[in-house]
A protein has these predicted regions:
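N-terminal targeting signals for export/organelle localization
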Residues: 1-23, 156
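A short beta-strand-turn-helix
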Residues: 15-16, 24-46
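Short active-site neighborhood of thiol/selenol oxidoreductases, capturing the structured segment around
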Residues: 35-59, 78
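Loop/turn elements at helix/coil->beta-strand transitions in domains of secreted/extracellular proteins
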Residues: 43-46, 73-77, 99-101, 129
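Hydrophobic beta-strand core positions in alpha/beta domains
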Residues: 47-49, 69, 80, 125-126
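Structural microenvironment flanking redox-active thiols in thiol-disulfide oxidoreductases
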Residues: 59-97, 107-114
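Thiol/disulfide oxidoreductase modules built on the thioredoxin-like
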Residues: 92-100, 105-154
Length: 156
């Protein structure tokens, strides 16, 4: 029998649940030259949170992401992307908060726009190990919600 090519993944690319998440790269905060690239996380459940220091609900939910990362960090990829052009306030905020998780910057707003976001924050996107969006929400989340979404994906 002749070898045949595997069919191409024809999943539509976009930001709706069920679509293949658009690839993006964002510079990691505090790591000179470090980058978070979605395609480099292939095979891992990836949790992406968009936030800003001026957004009260964003700041309130960041500890949940830090707890999720502490619990599942070896098994998942997680990044909290600051959606703002100004980084001075990020420096001050992260210096006083004790949040042990990766942070990145979206200085131009291109990353959040590519995932369908606007000026509304917070926004959370969860991508499964195959790169498909399984959760996309503008608004606050809780640790219980995050664990309830991530744990079943890791069990697959």
């Amino acid at each position: 029998p002749e070898a045949t090519e595997a069919p191409a993944d024809d999943t539509p690319v976009g930001y709706e649940v069920g679509m293949k998440c658009p690839d993006f790269t964002a510079p990691l905060y505090g790591e000179e030259g470090g980058e978070f690239t979605l395609s480099a996380q292939k095979g891992k459940v990836t949790v992406i949170n968009f936030w800003a220091t001026w957004c009260t609900p964003c700041v309130a939910e960041l500890p949940y992401f830090a707890e999720l990362y502490a619990e599942y960090g070896d098994e998942i990829a997680l990044v909290a992307i600051h959606s703002n052009l100004v980084t001075d306030d990020v420096d001050k905020f992260l210096a006083k908060e004790n949040l042990d998780m990766p942070f990145a910057l979206d200085k131009t707003g291109a990353v959040i726009k590519s995932l369908g976001g606007s000026t509304q924050l917070p926004m959370t996107v969860i991508v499964d190990a195959d790169g498909k969006i399984v959760y996309n929400k503008v608004g606050s989340v809780t640790l219980t919600v995050l664990e309830g979404l991530v744990a079943p994906l890791l069990a697959e």
